[in-house]
């Protein structure tokens, strides 16, 4: 693939995506979902998050018949972010799957939908592939771009393709060193993620991180159990990710109730809206919300307010003057919430 055969643009927000057609034609759209709204291409679309795309494969597994169809020279491919599924989807559209093992793409789809904590379920050679990729993508020069405008990322995607050519030994015997680097990275990353831990109970773990992905760190060495939920605040991207290990929490529903319809993801893993800057206050609000949801999945009661309310997750702005006091009372990370026999919630 030559870098200018097509143009690949990263469009990070819904607002920009709604305007993009005024600047260029979106011939193909891959992972262009922004909460509850999606941009679709004039020739090709590969989305799979929203209910309207239920049952659709991830971009990395979307069938593409390049024998009878291909993008024209100079076509524009639009993406909303750069991750493994997105990159593989672009590669498929460009006819670059021929050296990628089908098994790798199948697992990439599963991981994208269910979270990377499931990687241990797959054979050792598959774990080696993914650890090599994660190690490479964690290098400063390869980290995902954080942009606020429509950005040409053609050269960046080309660099990913070159990495996969090396990993899967297309041109030279470079795979063994990459595999070994991945194994070393995987060994080191567990210690590093634990150093980012803010607090934990047997049910959830909370992390503050900068670069290290902590969303799959369910296992607690302290409790010797697998927590149900991980909440991770990334200070580099000013974003929050919520993931669930057992399906007991709908992460996508949670983040959308916290931050509105532009937040998105899957039931098993979801995050704050792209382009939205969140802070530690929002992290604590997320933790507090999960505590309440664990006690009352449908009815929410504010411990700092007399009476009940059906919490719409925006009441701190519009309805409840006691909400900030309520949130601040949970700022002490060791605090817990207990439901009394009367049904009242009490902060301990």
Regions inferred by a protein language model and the residue ranges of each:
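A short, well-structured beta->alpha microelement
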Residues: 5-24, 58-65
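Exposed alpha-helical structural elements
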Residues: 106-109, 118-121, 125, 162, ...
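Short hydrophobic beta-strand segments
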Residues: 4-10, 25-31, 72-81, 206-208
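Conserved catalytic core of nucleotide polymerization and phosphodiester-bond processing enzymes
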Residues: 1
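Gly/His-enriched, cation/cofactor- and phosphate-binding structural elements
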Residues: 17-42, 48, 166-348
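Hydrophobic, aromatic-enriched interface-forming segments
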Residues: 122-197
């Amino acid at each position: 693939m030559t870098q200018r055969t097509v143009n690949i643009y990263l469009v990070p927000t819904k607002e920009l995506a709604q305007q993009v057609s005024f600047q260029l034609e979106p011939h193909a759209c891959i992972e262009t979902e922004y909460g509850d709204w999606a941009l679709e291409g004039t020739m090709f679309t590969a989305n799979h998050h929203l209910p309207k795309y239920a049952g659709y494969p991830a971009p990395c597994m979307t069938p593409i018949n390049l024998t009878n169809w291909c993008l024209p020279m100079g076509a524009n491919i639009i993406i909303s972010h750069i991750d493994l599924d997105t990159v593989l989807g672009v590669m498929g559209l460009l006819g670059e799957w021929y050296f990628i093992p089908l098994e790798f793409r199948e697992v990439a789809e599963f991981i994208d939908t269910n979270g990377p904590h499931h990687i241990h379920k797959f054979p050792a050679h598959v774990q080696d592939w993914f650890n090599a990729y994660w190690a490479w993508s964690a290098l400063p020069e390869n980290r995902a771009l954080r942009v606020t405008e429509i950005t040409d990322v053609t050269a960046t995607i080309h660099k990913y393709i070159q990495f996969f050519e090396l990993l899967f030994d297309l041109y030279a015997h470079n795979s063994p060193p990459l595999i070994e680097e991945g194994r070393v990275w995987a060994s080191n990353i567990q210690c590093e993620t634990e150093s980012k831990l803010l607090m934990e109970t047997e049910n959830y773990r909370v992390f503050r991180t900068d670069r290290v992905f902590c969303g799959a760190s369910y296992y607690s060495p302290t409790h010797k159990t697998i927590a149900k939920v991980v909440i991770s605040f990334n200070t580099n991207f000013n974003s929050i990710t919520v993931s669930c290990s057992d399906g007991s929490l709908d992460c996508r529903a949670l983040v959308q109730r916290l931050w509105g319809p532009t937040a998105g993801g899957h039931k098993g893993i979801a995050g704050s809206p792209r382009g939205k800057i969140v802070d530690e206050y929002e992290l604590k609000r997320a933790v507090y919300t999960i505590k309440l949801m664990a006690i009352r999945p449908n009815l929410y009661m504010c411990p700092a307010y007399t009476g009940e309310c059906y919490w719409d997750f925006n009441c701190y702005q519009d309805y409840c003057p006691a909400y900030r006091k309520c949130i601040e009372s949970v700022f002490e990370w060791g605090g817990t919430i207990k439901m009394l026999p009367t049904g009242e919630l009490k902060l301990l």
